């Protein structure tokens, strides 16, 4: 699976002005951005991390292919907790490092590419567009994806992102 170039900016400079204005308001700004945890790490977790920090395999990102046992456990959880039999609907369990990776790879995992169109809301998560472009597909932005008439006549729509 190769990737195509993408042209959409993904930088925080687009929101810098809004951030500055919010900080000027009494009480400041509430930061709800991606990757900004606010809760402290529990002591037990800190101790477990510290005790394994020097292990030979403790550096770098983990392999995300997942073990057979892990995929089986996920499959069982969906069946037991949600009543969904993933095998019956021919679904695959694809572990990722995080949801952003899953979103960025989704168009490629769906085998979308040149000539395919992905519909998304005009105001949406930037990674929708970046992932679509990486797959080589085209983005079609609409005001409201639930307004099917706004995109139903766009040729070659293969996927729709819904916020």
Q: What would you call each of these model-derived segments?
A:
Residues 2-98:
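N-terminal small-domain helix-loop-helix segment of the aminotransferase-like
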Residues 58-163:
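Conserved core of the PLP fold type I
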């Amino acid at each position: 699976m190769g990737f195509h170039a993408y042209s959409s900016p993904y930088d925080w400079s687009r929101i810098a002005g809004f951030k500055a204005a919010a900080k000027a308001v009494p009480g400041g700004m509430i930061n709800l951005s991606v990757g900004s945890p606010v809760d402290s790490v529990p002591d037990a977790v800190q101790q477990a991390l510290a005790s394994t920090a020097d292990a030979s395999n403790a550096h770098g990102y983990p392999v995300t292919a997942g073990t057979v046992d892990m995929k089986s456990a996920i499959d069982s959880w969906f069946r037991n907790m949600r009543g969904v039999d993933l095998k019956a609907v021919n679904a695959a369990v694809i572990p990722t490092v995080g949801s952003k990776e899953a979103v960025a790879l989704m168009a490629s995992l769906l085998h979308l590419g040149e000539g395919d169109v992905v519909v998304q809301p005009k105001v949406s998560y930037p990674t929708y567009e970046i992932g679509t472009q990486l797959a080589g597909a085209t983005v079609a932005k609409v005001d409201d994806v639930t307004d099917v008439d706004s995109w139903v006549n766009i040729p070659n729509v293969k996927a729709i992102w819904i916020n």
